[in-house]
């Protein structure tokens, strides 16, 4: 059977939304390794680290995100990625801010 490499991102995203951040981090790292140009994996890795309180790791991941996407802001997250629930949008924006990324 064919299993696309993006399954790691999608499962990691699900774990992130469920608050299972450690599992999400592992999957986002694998997703980045397999598809380094897929920027959402990098963004959610930043968020997961921030939610776990691992701010230094979140900041390191944010630097990597900015290398891949130089003009990224938390506003980019809500503009480019479909985030329906307001509470999820706020959590993502807060996580990105904790990592030192600009809001606009």
Q: How would you name each of these model-derived features?
A:
Residues 1-104:
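Alpha-helical protein-protein interaction modules
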